[in-house]
Amino acid sequence: MYKLKTNRAAAKRFKFTKSGKIKRGCAFRRHILEKKSPKMKHQSRGMHVIHETDYNRVEKLLPYGG
């Protein structure tokens, strides 16, 4: 069996927790922040756990956990 390649773009975007959950950064935080509400900017800080429907897709991109 040959080695599986890690998708490098996904490895830079996702992190695994010790319990096996996958975290991601938030979108819409790079620029044009003036028109966005303070609530939206505050809630998009930090990392968030991905939705369970996306787990299989991300795990295929990161066969060795990133």
Curated annotation (Swiss-Prot):
SUPFAM superfamilies: L35p-like. GO terms for molecular function: structural constituent of ribosome. The keyword Manganese does not apply. Pfam families: Ribosomal_L35p. GO terms for biological process: translation. GO terms for cellular component: cytosolic large ribosomal subunit. The keyword Ribosomal protein applies. InterPro entries: Ribosomal_bL35 (IPR001706), Ribosomal_bL35-like (IPR021137), Ribosomal_bL35_CS (IPR018265), Ribosomal_bL35_sf (IPR037229). PROSITE patterns: RIBOSOMAL_L35. Keywords: Ribonucleoprotein, Ribosomal protein. Belongs to the bacterial ribosomal protein bL35 family. PANTHER family: 54S RIBOSOMAL PROTEIN BL35M, LARGE RIBOSOMAL SUBUNIT PROTEIN BL35M. This is Large ribosomal subunit protein bL35. It comes from Leptospira biflexa serovar Patoc (strain Patoc 1 / ATCC 23582 / Paris). The gene is rpmI.
